[in-house]
Structure formats: structure tokens, C-alpha cells
Amino acid sequence: MFPPLSIRRFTGAALNDYLDAVARLRIEVFRDFPYLYDGNMGYERRYLQTYVKCPQAVVVIAFAGDEVVGASTGIPLQFEEDNFRQPFVAAGFDPREVFYCAESVLRKDYRGHGFGVRFFDEREAHAQALGGFRHYAFCAVVRPPEHPLRPPGYQPLDGFWHKRGYRKVAGLAAQYGWKDIDQPHETSKTLEFWLKSKQPSASDPVSARKSDH
């Protein structure tokens, strides 16, 4: 039986107490397909400092008792790296109106307990409390169906994301590099953006784009 499960939001310096636990969890979970990320604590600590230093950012942490078993990050797109911000600018979006639901990680044993839904709900609620956002977005790495490390029977999360109201936007993608666990060097990856709009109108850039879903 699991210890009591809970979820809490953290902003600013309050995240510091859990920084290393979240960093270790990200390395552990993102090592699996499809990310295959060969991570290290030094990079993860630097990356997570973005969320400590940005007062509008949020990290949602899932606990089993006192143990960190999941984490989900979100930040206004205007404070994200150029790799993620510029594709939106080029597509006609105002980064100040997009809240970026960056990443979610959860230990395998704790999947299927509603944490994935809560991660989206908590980040969107945080964005609503901040105000001024018309869109929520995240991205997912693109891997070929024939990838040698793709597990048998692997199912992407597209169906889950659709249920949360997100749609893949055709042509909206970023390039970002990291080292795969089976590669000697860092390589660039394509990440496709998914978007959820609050009361979209005909003037929204996404309205003129045809999604493949």
C-alpha cells in the first residue's frame, strides 16, 4: 500500500528544499523512451533555477508521504528559452499570452492515480490566478516508429492530451538538443507543440492552422 498521496504547488525560493529530489526524478524518468535523456545533476540544478528565480513560474510536486514521486513545471512563455519562445513569435503568437506547461515526470508505480490530470489542472489554475493568458502549451519529442529503443507496445500520450483539451498544431515545433542514452554525443531533436486556447477566436494564429488531430 502506498503512503498518503498528495500534491502541492511551489513557487520561488520554496522550491529550493526539493530541488535535488526533483532533479533526480527528472533524470530517472526522462531516461525512458521517448526522451532517452542521459541527464546529470549539474545541468538539472541549473535548469530548475529558472523556476526558482521566476516568480510567475510554478512547480507542482507529487508526494507519497514525504517522498517526491512526481513533478510538473510551468512558466509564462515570455520567460522561456528562445528555442521554445521563437516558434510562437514566428507563428504570430504573443508570448505574454501563452503559459508554457513545460514538463511532467512521474514514477511508474504512481501512474494511474490521477496525478497526470492534476498536473495539468494545477498548472492551468496557477496561470489563471496570474491572469492574462489566452493559451496553454507544451511540447513533445518526435521519435520515429522504428526507433530501436521504442518498447514493444509503446503507446504515446496523445489520447490523454486530447482529453485535457490540447491539440497538436501543425508546423509549430522547436529544435532542442540533449544526449541520448545510446548516443556518444548530444543531438538535436524536434519537439512538436500542443495548444489549448481559452475561447479561441478567428484572429488567433492557431485558427488558421490545420492540426493533424
What are these regions (language model features)?
Residues 1-24, 28, 200, 210:
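Conserved N-terminal entry element of GNAT/NAT acetyltransferase domains
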Residues 23-39:
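Helix-loop element at the rim of GNAT/NAT acetyltransferase active sites that forms part
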Residues 36-64, 73:
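Active-site rim helix/loop that mediates acceptor-substrate recognition in acyltransferases
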Residues 68-104, 148-149, 173-187:
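Conserved acyl-donor/pantetheine-binding loop and adjacent beta-alpha core of acyl/acetyltransferases
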Residues 98-101, 120, 127-153:
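Conserved GNAT acetyl-CoA-binding A-motif
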Residues 106, 112-128:
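Conserved acetyl-CoA-binding loop-helix of GNAT-fold acetyltransferases
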Residues 153-159, 164-167, 172-213:
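C-terminal "cap" of GNAT-fold acetyltransferases
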